[in-house]
């Protein structure tokens, strides 16, 4: 048995990166800015040829991304991976092989970024799911595929066929966003996929008003549909996270774009995302900051909402981090550096 001397540091649960893209990283190659694109379609159609031309392999670039996140406490990852005719299964196979070499958990989302229907990717997605992916993804089925009901029906059919979860990028606003969200709720209930469906970004949650707003948020909670956010700072874009939490909706954070074809920014810090969220929503007091940690730990917090000890407990998995922070609230607000992270008893990172 290995004994780690904590030197009177604070122990916290390991952080979970809930939304990233291993295959899109440009980390490790010379600086190249984001080129202008007139639409999401233009962006996705120029991205793959560019990534294929880079001097570093997907595996090398993904490792740079992982190495960027580990010092900030990440101990598990969920990555979306492009699967469509331009990539075939190349990216998926490489990410899956990489994941199998890591001591930490890597969940893989099959991501038909060019549109499940628009790019005729149903068969390829089916093949990737058969090879062991954890989730089926998608993006804006209303605006990109042009038939959100058919697109979502295929998505949930494949999820049911392979016994996997769903994690869909949803940037659409107003009617496009709200109708898509309501259809996801309906299909989650129909297929019995409670606790296995995630909506990433979910900007359209801002567009529900009045009684319908409460009804939809309550339905998300009832069907145990999770929301993933990268905490955008564009006005009126980030979902109303604190309101969702009050309704009992599970919310998680992820870094998303980190120096790729979509954004030149991103430092790989889940701590920064958490602190930014706290500032945006004016979270200041001890109890609220303590609970905020749960957004990057799958809901695990050191204290429960009544202030009682909640973690660690005897028998809990030995996945944790050590920090000089005085308490969880200080770790969240002050972004106190991580000194050591451990996954299942094995040291993953040491400062």
Question: What residues fall within each predicted segment?
Answer:
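His/Asp/Glu-enriched, well-ordered alpha-helical/loop segment
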Residues: 190-197, 242-323
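Active-site core of metal-dependent hydrolases
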Residues: 110-118, 130-238, 259
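Active-site mouth loops of central-metabolism enzymes
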Residues: 44-60, 107-120, 140-145
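Alpha-helical scaffold segments that flank or form the walls of functional sites
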Residues: 11, 28-80, 86-101, 124-130
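Active-site gating loops and adjacent loop-to-helix segments of metal-dependent hydrolytic enzymes
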Residues: 25-58, 180-198, 216, 255, ...
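C-terminal cap of metal-dependent C-N hydrolases
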Residues: 311-351
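Histidine-rich, glycine-flanked metal-binding segment
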Residues: 1-12
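Histidine-centered catalytic micro-motifs
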Residues: 13-25, 81, 165-174
């Amino acid at each position: 048995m290995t004994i780690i001397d904590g030197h009177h540091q604070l122990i916290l649960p390991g952080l979970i990166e809930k939304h990233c893209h291993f295959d899109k990283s440009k980390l490790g190659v010379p600086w190249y800015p984001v080129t202008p694109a007139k639409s999401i379609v233009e962006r996705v159609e120029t991205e793959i040829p560019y990534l294929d031309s880079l001097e570093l392999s997907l595996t090398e670039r993904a490792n740079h991304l992982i190495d960027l996140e580990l010092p900030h406490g990440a101990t598990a990852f969920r990555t979306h991976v492009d699967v469509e005719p331009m990539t075939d299964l190349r990216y998926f196979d490489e990410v899956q092989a990489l994941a199998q070499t890591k001591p930490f958990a890597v969940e893989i989302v099959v991501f038909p970024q060019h549109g499940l229907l628009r790019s005729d990717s149903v068969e390829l997605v089916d093949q990737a799911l058969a090879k062991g992916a954890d989730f089926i993804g998608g993006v804006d089925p209303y605006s990109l595929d042009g038939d959100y009901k058919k697109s979502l029906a295929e998505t949930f059919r494949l999820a049911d066929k392979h016994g996997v979860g769903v994690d869909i990028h949803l940037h659409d606003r107003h009617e496009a966003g709200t109708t898509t969200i309501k259809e996801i709720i309906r299909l989650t209930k129909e297929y019995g996929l409670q606790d296995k469906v995630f909506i990433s970004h979910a900007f359209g949650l801002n567009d529900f008003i009045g009684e319908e707003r409460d009804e939809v948020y309550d339905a998300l909670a009832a069907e145990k549909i999770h929301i993933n956010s990268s905490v955008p700072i564009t006005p009126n874009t980030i979902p109303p996270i604190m309101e969702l939490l009050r309704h009992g909706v599970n919310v998680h954070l992820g870094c998303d774009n980190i120096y790729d074809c979509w954004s030149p920014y991103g430092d790989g810090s889940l701590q920064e995302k958490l602190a930014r969220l706290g500032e945006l929503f004016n979270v200041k007091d001890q109890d609220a900051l303590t609970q905020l940690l749960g957004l990057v730990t799958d809901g695990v917090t050191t204290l429960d909402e009544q202030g009682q000890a909640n973690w660690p407990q005897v028998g809990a998995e030995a996945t944790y981090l050590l920090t000089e922070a005085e308490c969880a609230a200080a770790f969240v607000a002050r972004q106190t550096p991580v000194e050591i992270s451990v996954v299942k008893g094995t040291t993953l990172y040491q400062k």
